[in-house]
Each structure stands twice: as C-alpha cells, then as structure tokens.
A protein has these predicted regions:
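Conserved alpha/beta catalytic core and glycan-binding cleft of carbohydrate-active enzymes
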Residues: 215-216, 403-405, 420-588, 593, ...
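Hydrophobic residues within beta-strands of alpha/beta enzymes
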Residues: 51, 152, 289-291, 407, ...
Length: 907
C-alpha cells in the first residue's frame, strides 16, 4: 500500500533543514490507509541512495517521494515499532542503524517547567550530552536551549557534520531542542548547528558540555557517566559539620598552568600536579588552595576568566576524571579546594554563548546592559530565568560533581552596578531610577541560598571591590549571603603603606590602622592575590623599599602581619619564592630561586608562621568577632610600631611590628595578663634571613600600667620585624619554639629529597653551607579545648595618664652595609640579658628547590585581556582616615641603632 503523501510544506522545511518539529513527519506514526490500520514510517537521510526498514528477520524497501523523504506503510502494526534502518549510500556503503526519530523525549514536563522558572537544581543532568540506553539501544541524548531558533541539529563525525541529518525536536514552548542519537558514545566530538530567525546558520559548542577540545576546533566531547571512585568521604563529612568561619583558613592561590611545568615547558596533567602541589601546600601550612578558573577557556592569557565551557574542566591538564582525582588528592592531604568562578561576564566568541540562537540569548540585546566596555565581554542577562538557572546549576555542578569546597565569585561589583565601568549615557537605570542591578542582586541571593542550604560547610567568597553594604550578611537580614568578602580596601592600603620608605612611614601610619574601623562591617578575607603582581605593578618583593636586605625583611613583616591580623588570608603562589619578576602565566614559577639563602629564609618563615597560625586558635577562632582582637599600641606612628592582641576566650597572643630599620631596645607594651610571655616567632631571626638582633626568648609582665592595661612587658624590637608572643600558661607556649625549629628541619629535608633531579647544570644552585643540628624538640602536650577555659582578659579602659614627654627623634635608618662587614647585634636591654636567643637551626642548605625538571625560561611581559582597569577599594564609601586614639602611656626609651644590618650582596 502507498503511504499517504506528507505535507509538501512540512516536507520541504525538513529537507531544507528548516524544521523545528522533525518528529511530526519522521519516525513511526499510526496511520489508516484505505481502511487498513497500520504504521507509516518515514525517514530522511541526505545522500542516501536507498533505505530499507529492518524488523527482526524481515526487510522492507522504502519508497522515495518527490521531496526526498523515504516512506513505508506496515499494515496490522501499532506504534511503537522497534525497527532499524538499512541505509545504502551512493558510494556503495551500507549502514544499519536505529532510527533516532522513533524514541520519546528524554526530558519530562517537570524538567522543562523547573528550567523555565529558573529552579532546576540538577540541570546538567538533563541538558547537554548524556550517554544512555533507551529500550535496550545505546546512544547519546542531546538537549540544548535555543528559544528563538527555527531549527537546531546536532552534528559530528557520526553524520559527516551535516546539519540535515539529525534535526532536533523543539519541546513545546520551553525553547529546548532534544534528540536521542543511537550509536553515538563516549569521546565523540559534536556541535550544534542552529538556524537563526533570519535564516543564518551558526555552529556552536554545547553550553552544557562536560568536556571540550582545545582550539581551533572547540568541539564539545561526549563524556561517559562518571565512574570515578572517590576516597574523600571522611573529608566531606567533616566539612558538613564544621563552621568555616571559626576554623583556620590560609589560602594558597594557584594558576595550575604556571605553578610548575615539565620538560620543554610542557603543561603538567592534573594527576602530575596533584601530589606535588598537595605536598608543597601542606608543608607551607596552608589550609586551602584557590584555583584560578579551570573552567574551559580558549585564551590562556585570560588566566581562565574568559570562559567558553562552563561545565568542562579545561582539557589542558586532562579529563574531568583527572580533575576529580586532583581534588581527591587535595582532600586526602587535608587541603580544601576553592574555585574561582566567573558568573559576571563571558567572551564574545562566536562559537560559544554569544548570540547563541542568532539573538541575545544569554546576554542583553541592548549593549547598555549587555556589553562590558572595559573588558570587551558580554554581561549575563540575570532577568532571564533560564540564564539564571544555567549559572545556578553550574555552581552546584562543580560542588556536587567535583567536590569543590567553595566558590570565589569573580567581579561581583560589576554585577551589582548597572553603571560599572561606564560613562554617562552608556547605561540604563533600573525600574526605580537607581543604578543597582536588581536582577543580579536577586540572583546572588538565590545562589548563596542554594549553595549553603544544599551543601553545609561549602563557602562562597565575593570579590566585591566597592562599599556595597551587607555582602556577607544573612539574606534574611537584607544581605547577599556570602560567607566572606575580599577586603580590597585593606589590601590597597597595606601595600601602599609597605611601599613607603620607612623614614616616611609615620605619615602613612593610618593606612595600617584604618581597616579596623570597618573590620566587622563584613566578614573579610585579606587577599594578596595575582592581580597585585602583574601589569607593571611589580612583584611583592619589588614593591618593598630599601636595599635587598630591607626588602626581604619588609616582605616577611607583611606576610606575618597579613596572617596574624583578623580575617582569613590569601597569598598568590610564588610569594614564598621572593621573585624579582612579575608573574608570567606562560612559564613555571622560578623554583630555582630556592637555591638562594634569602629565599630559603623566606620559605622557612612562611612555614613557621603558617604552622603557628594553624596551631593557635586565637588567630582564627574569632576572626569576625570584635572580641577576637584588641589594639595594644596603635598610636606610635613616630616610631612606626604597631601592636595588637588576638583572643580566643581561652588563649591569646601578642603581636608587635617594628616597621623601620631602627631597632627598639626595651620597648614597653601593655600586656593582657601577668606572667611570662614567650617570643614564639621573630621574623628577624637569622634562620629567616634576619639580622639576629638580640631578643629575649621570654619576658615577664610587670605590674606597671601601660596602654590601658594593668600590667606591661618590655621587649626589644628588631629592625623591620614582627614578633609574636604567647603567655607561658598556655600549655604549648614554650614548646612551640622548639616545634617550629623542628618543623624547619623536617620541611627542609622533604625539599632536599625532591630537589630538581633533572635540572640542568646551568641552573643548579650553589651548594649552601651545612646547617647546625637542631636540638630534639619535645612533643607538645595536647592543646586545651577552646572556649571552655576562662575568657582571656579584655583590655580595660585606660586610666587617665600623665602627659607623656615627646619621644626623642629616631635616627635615620642606616645605609646599606658594605659586603665585607658582618652584622653585629645591638646590646640587649637589662630585661633581656637573662634569657638567650632561642635556638633555631639555619635552613641554609636544608631548604632546597622542589622537583622542577626544566630550567625556567626568560620571563616576558605579561598581558591580560580580561581586565584593563584596576579595581576600586572595598572599604566604606567615606574614605577619610581617622586614626584611633587610645590614651597614651609614658613614652618608650630612646631607640638603639645597631651598627649595621646583615650584609647584602643583591641590590
């Protein structure tokens, strides 16, 4: 019997590749012909000479109509029919395959409903490409959102990249096109061919692809269902029970492509990087790493911030399962993994999200809303539910599929303000006449609510560079709901201060104190990030003033200050190397620098301060509570001395910084309690590359009121240094000195055992002198349970003090010494004579370079396409600095200047 002729118009649209509903014609449909019930089967295959229907052992040739469709009527049959198609091509090839148009949709009505409302929390399981089996037939289900397309096809090598072969079905008014393609399996390359409303064809990668190839192809890659065997169950359970705000958080920011490279500048794989990075980070005392975006990006020079594949870990370093193994290795080492995530903008690549279906699909049509003039990128349309769902599901995808412990949300300020980076006339006001992006605000609240409610213990960190209020406050209180916010104001002020010549720092003293005026308005993270060591801003070491000795001393003080002040801390990779160069994303870090004694000292200092930070909860338990911090000496700008206490209810520490090259003998400080204080960290110790200026290892508090306290101590302050003191009644206060000494030796041995074996002779560092043997450190007793002991005394209100005489003018900082002269420590004060300087072994030979198989190439000037302008400060809008004014005590004694700091050979 002859099959009823299909509608000429529908048939022509299908043959021309213009149909959004190919299933209306193709596949098996119940039909009555001449009073006989049966099934009409239609097929379309470009370039086919003939097609036959195969059902079991039977085979029926199909008839070809005038439009190029093949058809067959089977009487006494009912749909569905499990038939196959035998296709014979003009070149004689014969292919037997299942017909993709005989299968039902793979998305249900509820999936589409939730997606169109922006509430589908597992959207990545429905859209994109999914290897699956339907009715015993293996294949891949494809689905994509293209609401204004007139036709969407999936193309690949499996159909000769011909958009007519696998035209997809539009599911109602959802804007989603779907098709199950039998026979397509894992690792197949594919793209979507989209016909726009104007008839133009666009070839796009899948926005939901789990993997992508590198350019110039940019094809999406079908991934099999994840079979990775996770081993971090204990980590995830502990994470869910912990309060991240009351736990230590010292973050190492990493760009995986340039942290370390292999021979001939080869990129290392995720599995190669994982054990090396975990070992290094753990040894340094960091608790977390923060990865610059590993979401697939075409341009390496964007550092990952111009994302092309939001659901695909970059294939530069391996497969999605390789990245899972990377995270698993970190968790096994006790290291959390934060991911830099970019929901603020996307690049204008024609093969990606830009005008995805020929219209402004993910972005705004109006460039005053949809374009970012500074970065040359598009801004997401947060008013569109499907776009919000894309981003929301993406955030949850990284947490659930890759066990990420937190998201650092990039460029939040650009999301919040409609006029961000724009001149007058370049932006549109919101419906209330303001400049706030109300839809972006709503999205950020939705994001934080979903992350924190579904995954307790996972954090979100806002890179928000303005004074937008309540960024880290609960959503129920009108906040955005972030866990932490980068303190950009503190970062800019602190670096500005440390750039100042020490002789003039008294005029910049409030740059260090001002941040405490707004410290508790948000929950802050203190970042010294990648943005501060690029674009001619210089490396951290080169920002420091003075000769080479002073620069390293300044850098140690900066690091110690950053870690011991309130707030969580972040350092960009390479800080520990003390490089003279800015970061270059095209090559490895300069690991060979660890052959230099100064860098060995810097590395040892970072290890020591990291260990001290993790061991003592007073440095992190109350980071975001005013009771966790108190000024001791805030007003001594004449001598550039700053002192503060850190408290934890049961423990406390005293921190004092002397930020000039002039040592201060017998400097008196108010003390929170009576008793003995041990100096547990001294950045001026020779172990760390310091001058070794004599400092008592312990000082006794005296009943002498000072700085508002009932008791005080006198301590000698080395030049350009930070000291940390712990009260003796803390069980491990004295032991920590020996523990840190032992730590330096152990870590040095670890570095020595893995020193770059394949390093070329040219780059091999000179052999450093052998360090003396360290005394065996006693095992520290168990730490006391926090918050159960009596509360540490708070600084009382200061009594009215007698008017203090003006301190004598400090002498000018000494000139850089000549190489021949050795440093002589200044004579210690009477109070320091009884106690000797604590013995800490020199790390000169001990700290050797890590494994680095190739010499570092010459560095090049870095460029960045993502951001052209520096970001503004995150401190409050009113930036007038009002110094804190405690009641002054009697002035300290006249400073004693050492004959000279240690010799410097580097300038």
């Amino acid at each position: 019997m002859t099959v009823p002729t299909a509608s000429a118009d529908a048939a022509l649209r299908l043959v021309r590749g213009e149909s959004a509903v190919p299933h209306d014609l193709l596949g098996a449909h119940p039909t009555t012909v001449e009073g006989v019930d049966g099934v009409a089967i239609r097929a379309f295959q470009p370039n086919a000479a003939s097609i036959a229907v195969v059902l079991g052992e039977q085979r029926w040739p199909m008839e070809r109509d005038a439009h190029g469709l093949f058809a067959l009527f089977l009487s006494d049959r009912t749909a569905p029919v499990a038939y196959r198609l035998e296709v014979t091509f003009g070149d004689g090839r014969v292919v037997l395959r299942d017909d993709p148009y005989r299968f039902l949709p793979t998305l249900g009505e509820m999936d589409l409903h939730l997606f169109n409302e922006g509430r589908h929390l597992r959207l990545w399981e429905k859209l994109g490409a999914h290897v699956c089996e339907i009715d015993g037939v293996a294949g891949t289900s494809f689905a994509v959102w293209a609401p204004n397309a007139t036709r969407v096809s999936v193309i690949g090598a499996f159909n000769g990249w011909d958009g007519r072969a696998h035209q997809m079905r539009l599911l109602g008014a959802s804007g989603v096109f779907e098709l199950f393609v039998p026979g397509v399996g894992a690792d197949a390359l594919y793209k979507f061919e989209i016909r726009s409303p104007t008839g133009s064809l666009r070839v796009k990668t899948d926005p939901y692809a789990f993997a992508m190839e590198q350019g110039p192809g940019h094809a999406s890659i079908v991934q099999a269902v994840g079979t990775y065997d996770w081993k971090d169950g204990a980590w995830l359970a502990q994470r869910a029970d912990a309060d991240p705000l009351r736990e230590p958080m010292l973050v190492y920011e990493v760009h995986l492509s340039s942290w370390m490279r292999g021979e001939h500048n080869r990129l290392l794989t995720y599995r190669e990087l994982a054990p090396r990075l975990a070992e290094h980070v753990k040894r340094m005392g960091f608790t977390h790493i923060e990865l610059l975006p590993v979401l697939e990006h075409p341009f390496g020079g964007s550092w990952g911030y111009q994302v092309g594949g939001y659901f695909a870990p970059t294939s530069r370093h391996g497969s999605p399962d390789d990245f899972r193994a990377f995270v698993d290795t970190m968790h096994e080492a006790g290291i959390g993994v934060l991911l830099d995530w970019v929901p603020a903008h996307f690049p204008k690549d024609d093969w990606a999200l830009r005008r995805f279906d020929g219209t402004a699909c993910y972005e705004h049509e109006d460039p005053r809303l949809g374009d970012h003039p500074e970065w040359g990128t598009h801004i997401f349309n947060y008013a569109r539910y499907e776009v919000r769902n894309f981003l929301l599901a993406n955030a949850l995808y990284w947490i659930e599929e890759f066990h990420i412990d937190g998201l650092r949300v990039d460029a939040v300020a650009s999301m919040l303000y409609l006029d961000y980076g724009r001149e007058a006339g370049q932006w549109l006001r919101n419906r209330f006449g303001g400049r706030e992006n109300l839809e972006a605000v709503s999205f950020l609240k939705q994001l934080n609510h979903a992350v924190h409610s579904l995954h307790p213990g996972v954090i979100t960190v806002a890179e928000e560079s303005t004074s937008w209020p309540r960024v880290t406050h609960p959503i129920s209180e009108g906040g955005l709901g972030f866990t932490l916010k980068w303190n950009m104001g503190w970062m800019h002020d602190t670096l500005d201060y440390f750039k100042v010549d020490p002789f003039f720092r008294k005029g910049a003293h409030d740059k260090l104190t001002f941040a405490m005026m707004y410290e508790y308005s948000e929950r802050f993270m203190n970042p010294l990030s990648h943005d501060e060591v690029v674009h001619l801003k210089q490396s951290l070491l080169e920002k420091m003033p003075g000769d080479i000795w002073q620069r390293f001393a300044n850098l140690r003080a900066l690091i110690g200050y950053s870690i011991t002040r309130p707030g969580k801390s972040l350092f960009f990779m390479g800080t520990e190397l003390g490089s003279h160069h800015e970061w270059n994303h095209d090559i490895s870090l300069e690991w060979h620098l660890l052959g230099d004694a100064r860098r060995q000292g810097l590395l040892a200092f970072m290890q020591a301060v990291g260990a001290l930070y993790r061991q003592h909860s007073c440095f992190w338990r109350r980071d975001h509570e005013p009771s966790g911090f108190g000024w001791i000496d805030v007003s001594d700008k004449e001598q550039s001395v700053l002192a503060y206490g850190r408290y934890d209810g049961s423990t406390h520490a005293m921190v004092v910084l002397n930020l000039t090259p002039v040592p201060r003998a017998a400097y008196r400080l108010g003390a929170p309690s009576m008793g003995t204080y041990h100096v547990v960290l001294n950045s001026d110790a020779t172990t760390f590359g310091g001058s070794g200026f004599a400092v008592a290892e312990a000082v006794e508090a005296e009943p002498v009121p000072y700085h508002g306290f009932s008791q005080s101590v006198t301590v000698s302050l080395p030049p350009m240094s930070i000291l940390v003191m712990l009260p003796a009644e803390q069980p491990d206060a004295r032991a920590v000195v020996d523990v840190l000494a032992e730590l330096v030796v152990e870590n040095a041995a670890a570095l020595r055992s893995g020193a770059g074996k394949s390093r070329s002779k040219k780059d091999k560092p000179a052999k450093a002198p052998k360090p003396p043997k360290a005394e065996k450190a006693p095992k520290p007793p168990k730490a006391e349970k926090a918050d159960k002991a009596e509360k540490a005394p708070k600084p009382p209100k200061a009594p009215k003090a007698e008017k203090a005489p003006k301190p004598e003018k400090a002498p000018k900082p000494p000139k850089a010494p000549k190489e021949a002269k050795a440093a002589k420590p200044a004579k210690p004060s009477k109070s320091a004579k009884a106690a000797k300087q604590p013995k800490v072994p020199t790390a000169a030979k001990a700290v050797e370079p890590m494994k680095q198989p190739v010499a570092t190439p010459a560095r090049k000037t870095t460029t960045r396409a993502r951001k052209a302008a520096a970001k503004t400060s995150s401190s409050p809008a009113v930036r007038k600095r009002t110094p804190v004014s405690p009641v002054p005590g009697p002035s300290n004694k006249k400073p004693v200047t050492p004959k000279s700091p240690p010799p410097a050979t580097e300038t």
